């Protein structure tokens, strides 16, 4: 997949989606689309449509953003050192579209101890009941 040009993305994405994914922004905590979503399904990159996270791995970390213990496929995620805002963190980006997604922290509950803290604006949620219809039928097995 070739990443769309900036002008195409400005037409396709909402202002907050563009700010987060293309300008490495952060949406407000607790005031975002998927923070409280509990429905089963997958979360895909809002730019490329690549599957990134599953509701099976989502949990309430109390931080105000959707949090996951792991990605669906680690090969779709790129981690980079982020030294912005006078901190050292690990930024999470999508491999194909190079979208800024959020950050990963070593304080999660899963076996790997990681918390993927992801901006809702970087994601599109596909409910379990609509996976096949939306072209993601191969991911139905995650919910068996």
From Swiss-Prot:
GO terms under biological process: protein repair; response to oxidative stress
UniProt keyword annotations, A-Z: Oxidoreductase
GO molecular function: peptide-methionine (R)-S-oxide reductase activity
Keyword flag Oxidoreductase: yes
InterPro entries, per the entry: Met_Sox_Rdtase_MsrB, Met_Sox_Rdtase_MsrB_dom, Mss4-like_sf
Reaction equation(s) it catalyzes: L-methionyl-[protein] + [thioredoxin]-disulfide + H2O = L-methionyl-(R)-S-oxide-[protein] + [thioredoxin]-dithiol
Pfam (any one): SelR
Active-site feature positions: 117 (nucleophile)
Matches recorded under SUPFAM superfamilies: Mss4-like
Ranges annotated as spanning the membrane: none
Secretion signal, residue range per the UniProt entry: none
Protein family: Belongs to the MsrB Met sulfoxide reductase family.
Protein name: Peptide methionine sulfoxide reductase MsrB
Organism: Shouchella clausii (strain KSM-K16) (Alkalihalobacillus clausii)
Gene label: msrB
């Amino acid at each position: 997949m070739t990443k769309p040009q900036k002008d195409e993305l400005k037409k396709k994405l909402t202002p907050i989606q563009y700010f987060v994914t293309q300008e490495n922004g952060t949406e407000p905590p607790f005031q975002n689309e998927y923070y409280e979503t509990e429905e089963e399904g997958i979360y895909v990159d809002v730019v490329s449509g690549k599957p990134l996270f599953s509701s099976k791995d989502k949990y309430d970390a109390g931080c105000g953003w959707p949090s996951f213990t792991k990605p669906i496929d680690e090969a779709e995620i790129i981690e980079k050192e982020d030294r912005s805002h006078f901190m050292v963190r690990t930024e999470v980006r999508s491999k194909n579209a190079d979208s800024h997604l959020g950050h990963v922290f070593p304080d999660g509950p899963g076996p790997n101890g990681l918390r993927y803290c992801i901006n809702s604006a970087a994601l599109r949620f596909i409910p379990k009941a609509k996976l096949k219809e939306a072209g993601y039928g191969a991911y139905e097995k995650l919910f068996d």
